[in-house]
Amino acid sequence: MLGVKGNYLLPADCAHRLVAELQGALDSCADRQRQLERSLRVSRRLLQVWEPARTPSPVPETKEEDPSPACAPSSQDLEELELLTQALEKAVRVRKGVSNAGQRDRTPTLTSKAATSGAAAASHPRAPSRGGSRVLGTRSTKGIQRATAPPKDYPEHRLRSKGDKTHVRTQDQTTGYGPDLRDQQMTPSSAHHTTELFALKEKGTLLQLPEDFRKAVSRNSCLWAQLNSARTNDSTDATRAAKTQFLHKLQMASGCSSHRPSATEVEAHARILRKACMLLRLRMQKELAIAPTDWMQEYRCLLTLEGLQTVVGQCLHRIQVLQAAVTEQLPGECLAETRTQASSVCGGEVDSACSPELLLYASTEELQTLATLKLQVALLHQQIHLEKVLMAELLPLINTQDPGGPPWLALCRAAYSLLCEGGERFLTVLRDDPAD
């Protein structure tokens, strides 16, 4: 015969507290699941085969020449384009006509004045000599310079220095309209230029580092060259000492060596840690002295104590780092005193278990095993917390009930199932009635 099933309802306040705890556990599990899914997506993305982005293949010209019906220009656009082309051609013709007319007006003046000056020079009776020819050439040159002076209608052409020659001034005047003419002759299609694609594989050698980086690279190359030369000639003790000194300088120059604090810095950090430990001790005593009146206050107190424990672990880790730095700097006779000072910062010995340790693994399978075990440990912590809450809520109810009755037995079995079996199994009692 199966055991008697008793119906027992929990008090309202107890049920509300248990439901809140279970809901919090479910929310934390959902957050952990989202974090795992996010890290899983990142890991899958990193494990994929990386391929550089390929440049798009050029489209054949035949396809570009046959535009789609959606991109075909309308008749109004064609008319506006034709009118614009005609206006540009007319402006070019007008500019050419103005420039040609200006050149024709200036050329007869130049030739006529040059001929007049030549005739005036020939009218003077001079003996044919070398000096006379030089004077004639000089006068003719000056006449040409006066003839090529710009008129008042063109203010942009000012008088230049006297050493300028005639052909230079003529060239400046004839080419004055060159840039404007070229700008007018440009077709609208030349404005549409295609951007050239930059491929790192093909044109990566054209890139240049900034000046600071180039200096650092050259200095690093020189240092490594000296290091290789020191490795090849490593026969004597002097060479070994020089190489050791050089490596030390290399580490100091590159900034790769860890910063070792001095004695004053260690003492300053020790004072800060002493003050932090004193504050932590006071806060912990205050939290332990408070008697929680409800489960929410007790839960907040537990969270505060967990936070204080984390801060204490960080302080202990910092103490170990300072102790290692002082051990490397001080001689062996001062190590005992250093350990005593470091251990007395928080009023006790330094426990290596409280300090965070590095996670080391040799393969991906080992890393997967470590992650699985970490999740299992987190799950066990959650179960232990829930069992503690259930114990605090159910045991007082069991003690207040009258023992021996079926409801009390059912309540005991339910408490045992929740506290000892994790709610996975429920005990049943088989009892045979004695025969009459």
UniProtKB/Swiss-Prot annotation:
Modified residues (Phosphoserine): 161
Protein name as it appears in the record: Tubulin epsilon and delta complex protein 2
Bias (Low complexity): 111-131
Record field: compositional bias (Basic and acidic residues): 153-170
GO terms for biological process, alphabetical: positive regulation of smoothened signaling pathway
Quaternary state and interactors: Interacts with TEDC1. Found in a complex with TEDC1, TEDC2, TUBE1 and TUBD1.
Lineage of the organism: Eukaryota, Metazoa, Chordata, Craniata, Vertebrata
Transmembrane regions listed in the UniProt entry: none
Cross-referenced InterPro entries: DUF4693
A GO-annotated cellular component: cilium
Residue ranges of the region described as Disordered: 53-76, 94-191
Pfam families: DUF4693
PANTHER family, sorted: TUBULIN EPSILON AND DELTA COMPLEX PROTEIN 2
Organism: Mus musculus (Mouse)
UniProt keyword list: Cell projection, Cytoplasm, Cytoskeleton, Phosphoprotein
Cell compartments where the protein resides: Cell projection, Cilium; Cytoplasm, Cytoskeleton, Microtubule organizing center, Centrosome, Centriole
Free-text function comment from the UniProt entry: Acts as a positive regulator of ciliary hedgehog signaling. Required for centriole stability.
